[in-house]
């Protein structure tokens, strides 16, 4: 069980977001952290991805070994083989954890408490939380609240009843990664916020419908952008989906805007679709001093949903839908 942090709410200043986008707390750049406690414990019996520094769990913050992440080449899953079985298994595990952590989202709970609970869920499955130690990322998931587009770092800020929060998580198990995310609505979110979240969820489904053997990657972005614009939202172009399997991030890069990608999908292609929709016409984000958190320039809210998909001989399977 998570310990409620409702009494802490008064310790955090409520900064009102731009009124034209609704009623919600704005997260300012000054709330960024630049140092962190030691990473959460992971048993040595659990396999870790190669990018995790050898001394990540034993050295102080900023003292970790530098691990170069080489530029990855596109990979395909061998259909009908052990690789397909493993990637399906870990993707399902990721969705199970997301569903479970979503039930714990409520006012007063801190994102750090959510991260701790999620970490324990993943470890209990014998899996590793892929973000932990990736380029020395300090937590096991990302939590992006209101005007934060992506890569928010879990901290001690309690959730407010007017918040929306995206939780993005990835598991590493049996040599493969499973990646998914969702945006959750708290109890007092206004209609503009709810409309944004629902539109983003639908935009993901529209992107999935553009997938299949022989279909063009660029059509995913075209369909998503057209849908978003029709509903009065913009799409952030600073983040993309990505190929995934044995490697956390590799080509193809899945753009959620109109683009000129000439690639076509083939059976065995495994990748994520993860559009970030933003209120208003300015979708640009600015990076906070923590080097990770990206928040909207305009102060508008952003929402994101993500699925991991696998192209098959006759269509597309959504591996993180259960």
Regions found by a protein language model. Name each.
Residues 2-322:
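Active-site neighborhoods and metal-handling regions in enzymes and metal-associated proteins
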């Amino acid at each position: 069980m998570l310990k409620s942090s409702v009494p802490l709410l008064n310790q955090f200043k409520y900064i009102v977001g731009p009124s034209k986008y609704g009623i919600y707390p704005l997260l300012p750049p000054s709330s960024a952290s630049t140092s962190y406690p030691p990473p959460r414990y992971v048993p040595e019996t659990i396999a870790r991805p190669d990018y995790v520094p050898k001394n990540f769990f034993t050295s102080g913050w900023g003292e970790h070994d530098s691990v170069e992440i080489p530029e990855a080449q596109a990979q395909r899953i061998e259909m009908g083989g052990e690789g397909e079985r493993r990637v399906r298994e870990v993707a399902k595990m990721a969705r199970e954890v997301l569903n479970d952590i979503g039930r714990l989202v409520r006012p007063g709970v801190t994102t750090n408490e959510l991260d701790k609970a999620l970490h324990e869920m993943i470890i209990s499955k014998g899996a590793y939380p892929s973000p932990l130690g990736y380029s020395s990322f300090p937590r096991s998931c990302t939590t992006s609240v209101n005007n934060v587009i992506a890569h928010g770092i879990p901290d001690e800020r309690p959730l407010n009843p007017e918040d929306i929060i995206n939780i993005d998580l990835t598991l590493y198990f049996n040599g493969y990664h499973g990646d998914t995310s969702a945006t959750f609505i708290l109890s007092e979110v206004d209609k503009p916020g709810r409309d944004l979240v629902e539109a983003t969820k639908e935009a993901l489904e529209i992107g999935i419908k553009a997938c299949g053997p022989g279909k063009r990657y660029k059509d995913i972005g075209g369909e998503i952008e057209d849908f978003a614009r029709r509903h009065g939202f913009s799409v952030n172009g600073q983040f993309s989906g990505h190929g995934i399997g044995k490697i956390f991030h590799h080509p193809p890069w899945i753009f959620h805007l109109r683009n000129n990608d000439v690639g076509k999908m083939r059976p065995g292609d495994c990748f994520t679709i993860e559009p970030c929709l933003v209120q208003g016409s300015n979708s640009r984000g600015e990076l906070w001093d923590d080097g990770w958190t990206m928040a909207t320039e305009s102060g508008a809210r952003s929402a994101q949903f993500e699925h991991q998909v696998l192209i098959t001989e006759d269509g597309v399977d959504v591996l993180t839908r259960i």
